[in-house]
């Protein structure tokens, strides 16, 4: 079969506006059926070719092609020969300055354009057109800027709008991660790749990159104690999750001393402005989603904000911030921790110490001097004697009060909430210097009073491990659930399914161990250190399905799985994810009631 006739069978899908022109053409009928078979067609295409057809010429602006194959679709049946290969004269420049192509060249170009368009999904955002990549089920757009680079005079400023671009912007590669201490990143989540202060970018994963699809949107905030991490890690690849019918957005936000910082010189420049710059970045990303996500097939009126660890803390902060309460319709909080945030005055003292640590005159350092310090030098301070960002800074427009206090006052977004924690959260708490003896002292109770709450625990080390887990994570989730249940429905979980290959090697599921099952990425990253079994994958699919249904409908119940009841102060009920999913009533009731009653332990 002539190649030109094969090309003809592909033409009806080409995204070009075609104009008709007449010319003689040979018959392709002898080969058309072969083209139909090759392309899986069952229609008798030979019937369409029983007469000689006229030449189809194409007239279009060359600039339209250069901008990425987005010229309006033409209806090829509207003009003679539109469905067929029709050779004719060579390409020439018309008197109008437009390019005229003969049929054969047109067909070759159309076929190339069609194939390229399938491989390069294009979306028009408010800032310009972006070109992503296409997998079998999902279109992926990586490294999309949602704010201007926070460099130079924009360091320690609220995020500013992106400068629009004129041509297609490639979105096939991850954007750079925000500056951080790489050693912490490698230990706590994976290699973030290239570090750059110009890091305010996000990634979109969508099964339908087209306006009007109105799919649920899930926006992910990564963990990392607000000092390390990246939305572009393989662990957070949104493609498996998006293949379930949701649009997934992952993002970077400023970290450590670049993201959460107070210094007298910076405050003098903009009195009263926010100092939780990382949270302001997250808010800017949510605003970007509201403006742009419809073009990617998402519903801007159905956004679920979900996050883990520091990302979960961020979700709680944004649920209570006056600047962001209306930017989400549902929330998922995975392993948030009850660690006090920093009052603004304490954060200011830390900022002065940072200035001294980089060789500047402490409180007398100027804003220009501070902004001249290399980002990597600031990031390197983390993990020394400076605790720069384990908690937010309380007392600015973003976080006017501690989130738990806002929940107590009923000033949070009144939206459905899914919240929980894992069975071995202490794996991370100990790494950040949270000692059991210190916690017990703060509680004002000794081991004699704790033992009745943990009758099956014999060793002191394990007792301390479980106390830390329950005080910092399990009780905190219950406390937030009780406070929120007064305003909106809450579903609570406890995750205790250790991967099959690690059974017997771990005391439970470590901090962050639920993330790969939620995203369905255990096969894409080395996050567990073992190859997932079919049992691991089945359990992960069931968990993913719950999260997706929650994003879709605002409740996590699915036919064929146990009914997950909403939690209330009276019921104290949750769903335990283990080898099976089991509803637990009065879960750890005595322990959690004791710790919550301790009052200030979970607050400032």
Per-region residue spans from a language model:
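C-terminal subdomain of alpha/beta-hydrolase-fold enzymes, centered on the catalytic histidine
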Residues: 316, 394-604
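Hydrophobic helix segments
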Residues: 12, 28, 35, 41-45, ...
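Alpha/beta-hydrolase fold nucleophile elbow
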Residues: 297-308
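Non-catalytic accessory segments of hydrolases
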Residues: 117-276, 300, 526-543, 552-563, ...
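Bacterial N-terminal signal peptides
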Residues: 103-114
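Alpha/beta-hydrolase active-site loop
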Residues: 272-294
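Substrate-access "cap/lid" subdomains that shape
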Residues: 188, 284-287, 291, 317, ...
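Glycine-rich nucleophile elbow surrounding the catalytic serine of serine-hydrolase chemistry
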Residues: 308-317
